[in-house]
Structure formats: structure tokens, C-alpha cells
């Protein structure tokens, strides 16, 4: 017979690293071309004027300017769009 109690096993104990998603540049902030504006999974926020979209749905600035958010009506639900407004002239 065993003289020690056997140790149990568990099916827990795993966790993934955080992906640091979210808004990186807020409305009114000045950004340079190539700056990451939003890291996201899927298109929660749509790219607007002077904003590009990476293959992982990251939104980034195409030109220097100021970040502007807007809400647009698309179908039955409202969507957010992010633009980069350049300085005129």
C-alpha cells in the first residue's frame, strides 16, 4: 500500500499573453505618418480619410495630421470611423 497520498492533477493553469489591443491615438491628438491609431480584432472601427488598414485590422495614419473620430450610419447599426485631418495649406 502507498504510504503517501498521490498528488492530484488539474486541467487549469494556462493563460495567453495579453495582446494590447485598443485605441493608441485618441481624438485631437497629432500623429505622424505610419503611427498606429487602433489595434483591433475585426473591424470595430472603420478606416476613413488618410487611414490605412493592416492585414490584422490595425488602423494606421497615412499622413501627418490630427485624429478625428466620427459615427456613421451603416445599415441598421451605427459604426465608428477614424480619420486623420491634415493641416490645410
Curated annotation (Swiss-Prot):
Q: What Gene Ontology molecular-function terms does this entry list?
A: structural constituent of ribosome
Q: What Gene Ontology cellular-component terms does the record carry? A: cytosolic large ribosomal subunit
> Does this UniProt record's set of keywords contain Ribonucleoprotein?
yes
GO BP, sorted A to Z: translation
InterPro entries assigned: Ribosomal_bL27 (IPR001684), Ribosomal_bL27_CS (IPR018261)
On the tree of life, the source organism's domain of life is Bacteria
State the UniProt keywords alphabetically.
Ribonucleoprotein, Ribosomal protein
Q: Where is this region: Disordered?
A: 1-24
HAMAP family to which the protein is assigned, alphabetical: Ribosomal_bL27 (MF_00539)
Q: Which family is this protein grouped under? A: Belongs to the bacterial ribosomal protein bL27 family.
Q: Could you identify this protein by its name? A: Large ribosomal subunit protein bL27
High-level lineage: Bacteria, Bacillati, Cyanobacteriota, Cyanophyceae, Synechococcales
Gene name of this polypeptide: rpmA
Amino acid at each position: 500500500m502507498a504510504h503517501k497520498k498521490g498528488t492530484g492533477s488539474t486541467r487549469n493553469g494556462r493563460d495567453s499573453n495579453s495582446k494590447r489591443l485598443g485605441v493608441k491615438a485618441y481624438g485631437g491628438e497629432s500623429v505622424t505618418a505610419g503611427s498606429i491609431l487602433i489595434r483591433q480584432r475585426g473591424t470595430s472601427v472603420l478606416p476613413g480619410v488618410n487611414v490605412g488598414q493592416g492585414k490584422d485590422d490595425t488602423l494606421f495614419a497615412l499622413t501627418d495630421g490630427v485624429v478625428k473620430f466620427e459615427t456613421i450610419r451603416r445599415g441598421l447599426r451605427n459604426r465608428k470611423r477614424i480619420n486623420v485631418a491634415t493641416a490645410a495649406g
